[in-house]
């Protein structure tokens, strides 16, 4: 009897919510998908951005809603109301006024960003006015499909797709690691010459396709011609960081055991492998160098993501109890101007990604650093509502604390790593990445590691001056020349 009463109460509660909540009805056209859809449907609303799907997640003000559906046929509507997962408020609690609105149906075919994943279905932007009447509803038809990107090759810029058995086995489908290869001008002029390879890992959101357009600079470090390989690391859950993980799969092993041998078989490489990257790319190349130390000659890491989890933004993950608030109850910044003045906060960044659920920065960290949970998703570093840190999850993150790893294992690693690593960063980094770098610097001093740390004026973006980049290239060129001398002995 009690179970029956509870069931009836639940039914009436759902009925009441549906009856008195703001509703959006979303469908997709048969031309965009000619079969039933199972997955997540997202709604993006913005007061300022005429194309809400292009908004910078966690930075631009945005209302987001998501529902999970099964077997929805073309033309059949899905209702998004107060039962949806919502940020920052439920549909009925939204401020009344004028909004731009778009919907997207996520087929999750492997692309990183939901709004830009090839195959996903989305609606044209609409301008709507949400009034006081909650019975007012809005209808959207998704009839656009995100197209596959086409790589435009030139004489010196080529696309390279390496089949990966390791990642194919993990994802249970055919999988390739994709890159853009920029050849030096000397490659065709001297057909017998072999060249060092410079692997460039892009930052979060970077894409190797762009190199077909932007790869205009000569493929050199200093005056040394190189084969430059642009790796973007994009995967369905974010940036793979080329680290083996429970959620993304064995990206590090796939790159080193499968991609690199195939690349060196196809192009005239001389065996010298150099690494560089900025931001998430900066973290990735440090990870690769420190975990495959004999494979790479040198690494120049620029403004790497958090290399010491005692400073994950403004949070000490090992001692602090809350990701959103500091000990005085103040919001922890997620992004700053000049490293001092917040323009976003971790709470809003994390909570909006709790709705969007995959492919953005905070979720990307979890996909790399966390174990896979019982629900098949990466374990959360914190409670998405309160910000309380899950110390059980932090235990797994420790494996990816590069500073901690080097400190604890330097005795065994020193022979293969001494002199190979240079880290540079701006002293006013927007995401406060300079603080964990300085902590790592102190740890490396303590173990007497031969490792260069260089600090420059500027933030995450303005730091990359001509002089900054010249210093970075100079280090790599010098290390390469030392490698050549060793090889001749």
Regions found by a protein language model. Name each.
Residues 1-24:
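Bacterial Sec-dependent N-terminal signal peptides
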């Amino acid at each position: 009897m009690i179970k029956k009463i509870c069931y009836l109460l639940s039914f009436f509660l759902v009925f009441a919510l549906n009856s008195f909540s703001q509703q959006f009805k979303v469908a997709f056209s048969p031309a965009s998908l000619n079969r039933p859809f199972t997955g997540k449907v997202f709604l993006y609303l913005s007061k300022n951005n005429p194309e809400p799907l292009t908004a910078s997640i966690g930075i631009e003000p945005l209302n987001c809603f998501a529902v999970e559906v099964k077997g929805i046929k073309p033309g059949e509507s899905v209702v998004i109301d107060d039962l949806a997962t919502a940020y920052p408020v439920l549909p009925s609690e939204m401020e009344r006024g004028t909004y731009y609105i778009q919907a997207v149906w996520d087929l999750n075919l492997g692309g990183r960003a939901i709004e830009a994943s090839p195959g996903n279905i989305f609606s044209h932007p609409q301008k709507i006015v949400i009034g006081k009447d909650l019975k007012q509803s809005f209808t959207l038809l998704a009839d656009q499909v995100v197209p596959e990107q086409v790589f435009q090759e030139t004489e010196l810029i080529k696309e390279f797709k390496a089949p990966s058995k390791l990642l194919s086995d993990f994802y249970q489908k055919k999988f390739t690691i994709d890159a853009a290869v920029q050849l030096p001008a000397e490659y065709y002029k001297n057909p017998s010459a072999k060249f060092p390879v410079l692997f460039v890992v892009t930052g979060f959101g970077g894409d190797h396709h762009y190199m077909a357009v932007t790869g205009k600079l000569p493929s050199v470090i200093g005056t040394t011609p190189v084969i430059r390989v642009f790796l973007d690391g994009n995967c369905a859950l974010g940036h793979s960081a080329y680290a083996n993980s429970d959620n993304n799969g064995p990206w590090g092993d796939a790159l080193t055991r499968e991609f690199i041998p195939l690349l060196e078989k196809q192009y005239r490489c001389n065996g010298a492998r150099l690494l560089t990257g900025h931001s998430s790319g900066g973290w990735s190349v440090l990870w690769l160098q420190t975990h495959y130390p004999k494979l790479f000659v040198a690494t120049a890491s620029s403004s790497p993501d958090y290399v010491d989890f005692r400073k994950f933004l403004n949070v000490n993950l090992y001692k602090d109890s809350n990701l959103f608030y500091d000990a005085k109850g103040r919001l922890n910044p997620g992004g700053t101007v000049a490293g001092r003045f917040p323009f976003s906060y971790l709470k809003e960044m994390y909570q909006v990604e709790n709705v969007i659920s995959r492919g953005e920065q905070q979720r990307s960290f979890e996909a790399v650093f966390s174990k896979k949970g019982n629900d098949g998703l990466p374990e959360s570093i914190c409670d998405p509502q309160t910000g309380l840190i899950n110390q059980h999850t932090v235990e797994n993150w420790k494996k990816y604390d590069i500073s901690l790893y080097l400190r604890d294992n330097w005795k065994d690693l020193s022979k293969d790593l001494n002199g190979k690593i240079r880290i540079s960063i701006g002293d006013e980094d927007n995401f406060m990445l300079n603080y964990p770098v300085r902590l790592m610097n102190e740890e490396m001093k303590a173990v007497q590691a031969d490792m260069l740390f260089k600090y420059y004026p500027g933030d995450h973006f303005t730091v990359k001056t001509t002089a900054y980049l010249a210093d970075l290239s100079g280090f790599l060129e010098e290390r390469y020349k030392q490698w050549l001398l060793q090889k001749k002995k």
